[in-house]
Amino acid sequence: KVWGILGWNIHLYLAHANVTPPEPESSTKGLGLNWHQDTSRVNVEMETSPRPRLSVKVALFLSDLSETGRGNFHIIPGSQKRDALKFPKGEGRKAKMRGSMPVQVAPGTAVIFDRRLWHSASANYWTESRKAIFYGYSYRWLAPRGPCNVKKYWDDLDPIQKQLCRQQPVDVHRYTTPFDEDVPLRVWIEKHLGKEAIQP
């Protein structure tokens, strides 16, 4: 449950599909790692340490990644609290880092991760392309990082879906001071789980 992590004042701020084709037999790419945290300038301009969470991603893996070498998602557990990593000289961000691990999952598995988590894609040495869809959820006051083109379906969406698909409030102040009509997710949570579930 994304709202169990971020709360109810959220929307979908990005969505994208990633396809990693198989490497050719002659490939010298190795693991093909490139360690990073998401959201670029946020990691430079936030002055606190550790930096605030602000968003989470849901990675929906469509391919069978139950074995390594298939373009697996690599992570360093616990690294979301580390603003920087010390990379080995010569290898830099391509290095296999101590404590890192590939995520091995069956097709259809959803993995929720903090945007601050140091992670990487990897090279695919399987016979099939690795396919995954990433959904990023953030607070409504954080600007989106891509379009949400659902206009043709808008009338069929329920109020919570409209909130998640960035329905604009009548006043910009209501991104940070929302009314119930702006955040039907809050109304739903309170109805089903009680007032304590929507605090603070």
PLM regions: where:
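Short N-terminal helix-initiation segments at or just after the protein's N-terminus
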Residues: K1-L6, T48, P52, I76-Q80, ...
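Signature of the catalytic double-stranded beta-helix
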Residues: K1-P22, V42-R53, L62
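Short catalytic/ligand-binding loop motif for oxyanion handling, primarily in non-cytosolic enzymes
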Residues: H11, T20-P22, S26-S27, S120-S122, ...
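A structural signal for short, well-ordered beta-strand segments and their strand-loop junctions
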Residues: H11-L14, K57, H74-I75, I112-F113
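Short, well-ordered beta-to-alpha junction loops that form the rim of enzyme active sites
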Residues: A15-A17, G78, R115-L117
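A structural signal for short, well-ordered beta-strand segments
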Residues: A15-A17, V58-L60, I133-Y137
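Catalytic core of non-heme Fe(II) oxygenases with the double-stranded beta-helix
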Residues: S26-V103, L142-K152
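Conserved double-stranded beta-helix
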Residues: R82-L117, S122-P200
